[in-house]
Regions:
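Active-site catalytic microenvironments in core metabolic enzymes, especially phosphate/sugar-handling
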Residues: 40
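FAD-binding core/adjacent interface of flavoenzyme oxidoreductases
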Residues: 1-11, 27, 32, 79-127
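N-terminal Rossmann-like dinucleotide/flavin-binding domain of flavoprotein oxidoreductases
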Residues: 44-103
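Conserved acidic E/D residue at the C-terminus of a beta-strand in Rossmann-like folds
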Residues: 33-37
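N-terminal Rossmann-fold NAD(P) dinucleotide-binding loop
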Residues: 17
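Aromatic pocket-lining residues of Rossmann-like dinucleotide-binding sites
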Residues: 24
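Glycine-rich NAD(P) Rossmann-fold beta1-alpha1 loop
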Residues: 14
Length: 127
């Protein structure tokens, strides 16, 4: 098994994950972010976001998440397009399993996995 060490490992790439990454990176903690199944989170499938400060005319969800990612990278966040499949908090440093076998050791883990839509299967839901 390949082993690496991180100060802060962030699971999830929605608004909470990227905000955590920006703050951790600005603090000099060199965060490592794993995007998960849906890079950018639910906002990547959202059209108009009109209730977020800084966008007086609104913004498309995918554009907003691209900008969050760019800002996190600008401050030094390392971003991986991979899934964290398990976390072991019983040892320190903590261990996160990436995919099937790759283990990353880390001093801190931020879980920002967000939410996912629960579809009911009714006709009006697609409108």
């Amino acid at each position: 098994m390949d082993q690496a060490v991180a100060n802060v490992l962030i699971i999830g790439s929605g608004p909470a994950g990227y905000t955590a990454a920006i703050y951790a990176a600005r603090a000099g903690l060199n965060p490592v972010l794993y995007q998960g199944n849906q890079p950018g989170g639910q906002l990547t499938v959202t059209t108009d976001v009109e209730n977020y400060p800084g966008y007086p005319e609104g913004v498309q969800g995918p554009q907003m998440m691209r900008e969050f990612q760019q800002q996190a990278q600008r401050f030094g966040t390392t971003i991986h397009a991979a899934n964290v499949t398990a976390v072991n908090f019983s040892t320190y440093p903590y261990q996160a399993t990436i995919g099937d076998q790759h283990i990353v050791k880390t001093k801190a883990i931020i879980i920002a996995t967000g939410a996912s839509a629960k579809w009911l299967g009714i006709p009006s839901e697609k409108q």
